């Protein structure tokens, strides 16, 4: 079986122009069908499965079996909880099912740390599929999601455009989108948007990301490592160049995913909205990797705040939110991987959000006192906005340097 799969051609998702040619040909009947208010569900399924399989062939062929196991595992526990939730509601049963749904991802993240090898359960896209499955469990607990068929579940989990790296969608939003076929005017607007996304994606991923990631970054890293020390000027260059490379590469991928989703009649959530013009850290997370940020906000941060307040863990509401910020972002760090720099990245952003909130509260108090004293509030103009953008941008770039793992090489790798 594995030998047969290895013989199949490998197509890296959004990796080269040929991928887009093959994908465009495959999507043409789908788009024409939508134009005449018809969905070819079986054909859509075949296209999704074909391109997912071709993304996992070659050296990745064993991942196809891992994906099959994973899907069966999720069907068992998602449907187990669906059946249970239709009759009863117990928080421990909810916690157990949530844990079981996340368990394959936990094993995938932990195994390399323990024995230095990749887990047999690992496959391209497991993190993002786990977000989808856990989101369904949580929405069933909330009563937002009650009924869905096996076909709808599989269509959501195996939606090809966003399979490998998001954006992260929610079942209810996705399914409503799928069931409501856009009219011709909407569809033409989606086509126009898709063309813009593809052009911007090519600029981001194949031009700008190549310049920053392939041309500028390697020599800067080499210079920084040769100089050594805690920090040096080339490391400062690495910080900015890596940050731009990360953005253009990931944002370019997201543009492609949005474009292909549009061509399949689905308006997937956007992931980036000019994050580098953010005036503070909270605004940054409302603009950067938005589908991930909003998922953690809704399903981790808000629920953690409710649990802490309900159990009166802290008397002060601000302390509660501060602790929730740090835990929320630390969990996000662990999701990226169990390394000190991913975890430090999460804690760094958690502390950044705490400081951000503290400043907003302090600013509110200062303005209130100034009003009582007959003074104008603290200035808010283009200069204060520029200062906020400057501070936030450099703070974010420093966090990306931590995230990159380069400091691990600079500080701990023997030369």
From Swiss-Prot:
Pfam families (UniProt xref): MBOAT
Residue numbers on the Cytoplasmic membrane side: 37-40, 88-90, 143-149, 180-183, 265-274, 312-316, 374-381
Domain of life from the UniProt record: Bacteria
Catalytic residues as annotated in Swiss-Prot or TrEMBL: 336
Entry GO CC: plasma membrane
Main location per the UniProt record: membrane
A GO BP entry: lipoteichoic acid biosynthetic process
Subcellular location: Cell membrane
tRNA processing among keywords: no
Record-listed E.C. numbers: 2.3.1.-
Membrane-spanning segments: 17-36, 41-56, 61-87, 91-115, 126-142, 184-227, 233-264, 317-336, 340-373, 382-404
Residue spans, topological domain Extracellular: 1-16, 57-60, 116-125, 228-232, 337-339, 405-415
Pathways involved: Cell wall biogenesis; lipoteichoic acid biosynthesis
Membrane topology type: Multi-pass membrane protein
Alphabetical UniProt keywords: Acyltransferase, Cell membrane, Membrane, Transferase, Transmembrane, Transmembrane helix
A single MF term (Gene Ontology): acyltransferase activity
Keyword check for Phosphoprotein: no
Intramembrane portions: 150-179, 275-311
InterPro entries with a match to the protein in the record: Ac/AlaTfrase_AlgI/DltB (IPR024194), DltB (IPR024024), MB_O-acyltransferase (IPR051085), MBOAT_fam (IPR004299)
Family: Belongs to the membrane-bound acyltransferase family.
Domain comment quoted from the record: Consists of a ring of transmembrane domains, which shield a highly conserved extracellular structural funnel extending into the middle of the lipid bilayer. The conserved catalytic His residue is located at the bottom of this funnel and is connected to the intracellular DltC through a narrow tunnel.
Function: O-acyltransferase that catalyzes D-alanylation of both teichoic acid and lipoteichoic acid (LTA). D-alanylation of LTA plays an important role in modulating the properties of the cell wall in Gram-positive bacteria, influencing the net charge of the cell wall. Catalyzes D-alanylation from DltC carrier protein.
Protein name according to UniProt: Teichoic acid D-alanyltransferase
